[in-house]
Structures are given as structure tokens and as C-alpha cells.
């Protein structure tokens, strides 16, 4: 899904075409997980994959889409991924399902945080029995790193800093810190 920046009133926002057609609906991961019996022995990540496949989604496509938003959330420091902002798209006529594209990354780029730093952070949605869920633990769930060309993102931190500077709401020092941390995340 191609995204672009636009102005909405007095705000700079990220926009895209509607990800749904008139005959599609979004089914949140929460709804998907509630519709399928829990399988003992599966961690919460694998439970999601199992449930989505049980609803008819292609398992490989779900795994890839999940990897995509896990990586994007880490790169952007998204602190608000939860079971209501990822899921499946279902065709209401054919009942075919596919993973939804990435959406709702509004709590990222250190928004709402005083310090822009490189510390790990509390991250959802997948919990573990071995400790507090964190961004680095979420990142370890990525199954296929060969799909990602992180070298292609070498200019991305500068582009982010430039776009944020257009809002004229950030001190240059904060923009520099965001740029530096994004570079380290890559």
C-alpha cells in the first residue's frame, strides 16, 4: 500500500488509499483469535498464525505480513501494536481472507516520549513466559530476514528527519536524535 504525507487542517498526516474495497471488511486479530480454539503449546505469535490460517488465510502470507509489521514497528519504534491494529481482510462475498497491510503506526518515532534514546521498550502484542515483552523480543520472532533489504533504507533516517522538520514542532536536537536512533535501528 503506497503511503504519502498530506496536511489535514493544521496537522501533517500519513495517508493512503482505502485498504478495503466496498465488499471487504477488516477482521482484527482479536476477533480472529476469539473465533478459534486455543492450541496448547503454541506461543502467542504462533497462536496468531494458527488462528489466521484456521480462518482460511494463506499461512505463508500471514507469516510474511507479521514479519513485516514486526520489523516496521521496531524500525519506527512503534509502541502501540495490539490485537486491534493488525488482522485479516475478508471478502464478504467469497469469504476469502488475506492479511491486512500495515496500519496504525501513529505511536511511533518517540511520540509522547521525552527522551529519544536507544533503550529497549515495552512492546506488544506477543507475550512470552520468559519476561516482560519488549521490542527486541518481538524482533526475535521475525522468521525470514532474507526478505528484507535494510541497506535500501540508508537514506530513510534523513527523509524522516526532513519530513518531521516540515511540521516545525521539533527542536533540531530532537530531530538529530531521532535520525541517529533510526540509523542505529537499521
Predicted regions mapped to residue ranges:
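Conserved kinase catalytic-core segment
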Residues: 46-109, 114
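Generic structural signal of hydrophobic/aromatic residues within well-ordered alpha-helices
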Residues: 29, 48-52, 62-66, 160-164, ...
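Conserved ATP-binding subdomain of kinase catalytic cores across diverse folds
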Residues: 1-36
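C-terminal catalytic region of ATP-dependent kinase domains
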Residues: 93-186
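Hydrophobic alpha-helical segments and helix pairs
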Residues: 28-56
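Short, surface-exposed acidic
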Residues: 2-3, 59-60, 173-174
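Alpha-helix initiation and N-capping motif
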Residues: 26, 41-48, 157, 175, ...
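Generic structural hydrophobic/aromatic packing signal, biased to beta-strands
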Residues: 3, 16, 86, 99-102, ...
